[in-house]
């Protein structure tokens, strides 16, 4: 590792220590809360990053059998699910399955959009809230604003459409090994004291699998502010940039992330990794 890289890490740490809010002591390993609280995570100095979105969908990018595998080299992984499943091993394999519903589930909502950006969707949502509507920003494929269908219909000049769909199945994750298939309810917390390898890629130590607003699932990384910025700066400005430029960009990136941390509230995480947010790759990522 080059002296300049070590110096950059030292500067990141010192600079960010002065910038960040105090980080409260985290819960003990294996005792993570199952209720994802986005505000609490920010107060504790953490971002929740949606690494893989829409898991379980037909085009989610997973293998045909739709599984996701977590492994470690030395230490054990721990899995805890909302429905009480606990598992400890060096390999965890989760498979997403479509399970038929006994009774079809009808979903209805009023939809505004699509919008070209989160900012324009958020402005519409704020406008609707001022008029008394329970508006939420969502990102199923494009930025949209949703309000419940049972609220008094706004004037047609608002240019909304009625979304109606009946679902006869839902996507459920299962913990699968050679001995059993265990149904999991989310959020699902997976952690280790060492870095976790996910589908062959080296990531971090703490993850959630959480259901989103669209019936699919998201792999969410829990990461502290300073580590998040280390995963942003090389792609926003370049790690070889002058140190003063790196420090200035660190302030800009942190401010942007905090200001935009409500983008994916409806899906239980703060930020994504693509161009809808700051470009981010886990700082420990190795292929």
What are these regions (language model features)?
Residues 2-287:
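Conserved, single-site charged/polar hotspot
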């Amino acid at each position: 590792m080059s002296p300049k890289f070590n110096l950059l890490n030292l500067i990141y740490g010192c600079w960010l220590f002065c910038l960040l809010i105090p980080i409260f002591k985290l819960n003990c390993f294996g005792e993570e809360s199952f209720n994802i609280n986005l505000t609490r995570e920010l107060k504790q100095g953490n971002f929740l990053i949606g690494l893989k979105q829409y898991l379980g969908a037909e085009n989610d990018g997973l293998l045909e059998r739709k599984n996701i595998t977590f492994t470690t080299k030395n230490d054990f992984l721990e899995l805890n699910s909302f429905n009480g499943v606990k598992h400890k091993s060096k390999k965890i394999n989760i498979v997403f399955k479509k399970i038929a519903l006994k009774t079809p589930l009808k979903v209805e909502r009023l939809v505004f959009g699509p919008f070209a950006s989160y900012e324009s969707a958020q402005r519409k949502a704020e406008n609707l809230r001022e008029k008394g509507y329970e508006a939420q920003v969502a990102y199923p494929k494009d930025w949209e604003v949703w309000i419940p269908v049972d609220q008094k219909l706004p004037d047609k000049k608002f240019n909304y459409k009625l979304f109606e769909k009946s679902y006869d199945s839902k996507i459920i994750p299962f913990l699968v090994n050679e001995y059993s298939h265990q149904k999991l309810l989310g959020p699902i917390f997976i952690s280790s004291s060492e870095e976790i390898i996910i589908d062959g890629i080296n990531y971090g130590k703490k993850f959630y699998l959480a259901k989103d607003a669209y019936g699919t699932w998201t792999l969410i990384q829990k990461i502290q502010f300073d580590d998040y910025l280390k995963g942003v700066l090389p792609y926003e400005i370049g790690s070889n940039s002058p140190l003063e430029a790196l420090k200035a960009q660190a302030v800009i990136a942190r401010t942007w992330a905090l200001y935009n941390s409500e983008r994916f509230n409806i899906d239980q995480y703060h930020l994504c990794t693509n161009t809808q947010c700051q470009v981010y790759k886990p700082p420990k990522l190795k292929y």
